[in-house]
């Protein structure tokens, strides 16, 4: 089963910042299985953030929980892997500063909360839920962590 969100050929859009939009990024049967097995109760059991509107289940939990549907463990494992990291860097190679000096060395990449402190680049895969808010949006314009090289969203 191919869980790679970049399995379709895509072009980097440069304006207003380097990004990609991939319609139907996963085969429908894979997406449907992820949707049908989404661990809503587990995500909602985490400590709420952002004044109680945001719940996050991070890679350290997704990679360790034995009761989790296998597809979610595999999805998280792939999207925190060296292979995934390399594919994203390859896609955005013209836009990533050379100062990062990654040199494609596997021991420099590890999943946040799972890898030890010796890695240079930490990856993460999170399941996030926001409380429904009817008056306004729960996410105003913002910058994520300035230490992040990239972030991706799957809806």
PLM regions with names:
Residues 1-155:
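Fe(II)/2-oxoglutarate oxygenase catalytic core
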């Amino acid at each position: 089963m191919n869980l790679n969100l970049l399995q379709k050929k895509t072009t980097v859009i440069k304006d207003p910042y380097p990004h990609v939009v991939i319609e139907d990024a996963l085969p429908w049967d894979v997406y449907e299985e992820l949707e049908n097995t989404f661990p809503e109760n587990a995500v909602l059991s985490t400590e709420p953030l952002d004044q109680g509107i945001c719940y996050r289940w991070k890679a350290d939990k997704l990679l360790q929980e034995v009761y989790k549907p296998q597809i979610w463990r595999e999805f998280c494992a792939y999207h925190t892997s060296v292979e995934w990291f390399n594919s994203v860097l390859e896609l955005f190679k013209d836009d990533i500063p050379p100062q990062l000096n990654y040199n494609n060395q596997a021991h420099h990449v590890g999943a946040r909360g799972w890898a030890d402190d010796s890695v240079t680049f930490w990856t993460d895969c999170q399941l996030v839920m926001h409380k429904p808010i009817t008056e306004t949006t729960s996410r105003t314009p913002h910058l994520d962590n300035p230490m992040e090289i990239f972030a991706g969203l799957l809806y």
